[in-house]
Amino acid sequence: SLLKPYMSLPENVDSLIFRRGGELSGEFNELYNALFNKADRYINLVKLLSTRREGFTRKEIEATTGYSGGSLTKMLDNLERCDFTVSYSQFGNKSKLTLYRLADFFTLFYFRYVENNRSRDDQYWQHHFMDRSVESWEGFSFEEICLRHLPHIKQGLGISGIATESSAWRFIPQKGDERKGTQVDLVIKRVDKIVHLVEMKFSESPYTISKEYEEKLKSRRNLFMEMTGIKRGVVITFVTPAGVSHGLHSSIVHSQLAAKHLFADILEKTISL
């Protein structure tokens, strides 16, 4: 392992990535050049994908990059085979609306904190890991972990034996529509006609739902039902590290899971040892 046990995590990150000559300071370009011919095209593509958490449709990728046809198909396939990206359907399962999302943590971290870092500060991460931007990074990372543990989410909800379809949903208002755009990064549609709108929220303590956020959740659920034509059975599920705090506005939560559900297999093995 490159991690040094006598160092804290921020110290290790600085030593590996931000220190000049660090073992991973040049890893990004070396990695892409080692894996792909015409690596610059792949880097341009993943850089675009890094700018939108929910991902891009192929049409959006073509319009922005100018890549198209078989060469774009090959690039998207190669990136997914190497686990840099994931593709998933939008609710309704229309293949033309497939979303391509950047899922590699190192690539995401590179574009967010390394590529444009001109500070030349060998202790950059120690000086900035408590910044607000890192809080949003923690939230994004937690969402990505949740999406990679979908079978555990189903298991925690007690629906492992029920046929389901997992997708994303987003609403983009047309010109003249005053409603705001919104999205749900994980929608689980069950064969028994229950639909889970899954909220994945990072918090070091039990997550507290405010009055404003409760209203936002209600509005989003109503919009989802209106746009999809689903009349009933749409419920809100939360996945958080430590659960949802019981309060005045928590009744909107139909079901909730915590980190222990995402890592149930590991915890069981640890206990058995």
Listing of model-derived features with the role each one plays in the protein:
Residues 37-54:
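Short amphipathic alpha-helical interface segments
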Residues 18-42:
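Short alpha-helical segments that sit at the start of domains
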Residues 80-91:
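A short, conserved structural fragment
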Residues 45, 57-64:
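A short acidic, leucine-rich amphipathic alpha-helix
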Residues 65-82:
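Short amphipathic alpha-helical interaction segments
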Residues 1-26:
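Amphipathic alpha-helical "lid/sensor" segments that cap RecA-like P-loop NTPase cores
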Residues 91, 98-273:
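A cross-kingdom feature that marks ATP-driven nucleic-acid transaction machinery
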